[in-house]
């Protein structure tokens, strides 16, 4: 494991197969870029392309994310989900279930129209798998590709981790649900 993705709790580390499966279903990712030393985060729909070991996102043709990537190609990416809250007898012992991936790599704005179209189609396939181009919607056109930015993050290193408590963990509850025994 590389230095940037080294974990303190190796008992929660997940393998590459788990990471790929998690990225296939995680609904939202966050891309971290830098502008003149100022970190910037942008939440995006995303898709992991196993054949390229890359993450695709798309954004507006102009904007901070694209400008930051054009200036500094090194980025970080994360996708995560929160499970149940795990109460305890002491405040500092409260915990939470979670699963997530952190990736580092180099991002580029995809200039090749064919690859940009493939990246957008992968996004559509992930988020609307029941719909097919040419049957349920008009396929992506060259004009549409010129009106958006498709970005590819070539993953250089990644890590995944998960914490999951027993199903019968005393008092466990989901955020924004009433706690067991609460009002």
Predicted region positions:
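A generic structural signal for nonpolar/aromatic side chains embedded in well-ordered alpha-helices
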Residues: 23, 68-69, 123, 153
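Short beta-strand segments
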Residues: 25-61, 77
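A generic structural signal for short beta-strands and their flanking turns/coil linkers
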Residues: 27, 42, 51-53, 71-75, ...
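Short glycine/proline-enriched turns and hinge-like loops at secondary-structure junctions
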Residues: 39-40, 68-70, 165
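Histidine-centered metal-chelating micro-motifs
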Residues: 62-67, 76, 85
């Amino acid at each position: 494991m590389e230095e940037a993705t080294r974990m303190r709790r190796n008992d929660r580390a997940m393998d590459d197969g788990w990471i790929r499966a998690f990225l296939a279903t995680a609904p939202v990712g966050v891309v971290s870029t830098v502008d003149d030393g100022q970190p910037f985060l942008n939440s995006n729909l995303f898709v992991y392309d196993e054949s390229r070991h890359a993450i695709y996102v798309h954004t507006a043709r102009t904007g901070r994310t694209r400008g930051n990537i054009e200036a500094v190609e090194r980025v970080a990416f994360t996708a995560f989900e929160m499970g149940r809250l795990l109460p305890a007898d002491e405040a500092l012992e409260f915990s939470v279930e979670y699963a997530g991936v952190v990736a580092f790599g180099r991002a580029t704005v995809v200039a090749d129209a064919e690859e940009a179209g493939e990246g957008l189609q992968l996004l559509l396939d992930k988020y609307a798998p029941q719909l097919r181009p040419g049957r349920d919607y008009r396929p992506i056109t060259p004009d549409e590709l010129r009106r958006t930015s498709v970005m590819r993050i070539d993953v250089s290193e990644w890590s995944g981790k998960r914490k999951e408590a027993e199903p019968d963990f005393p008092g466990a509850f989901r955020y924004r649900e009433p706690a067991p025994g609460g009002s």
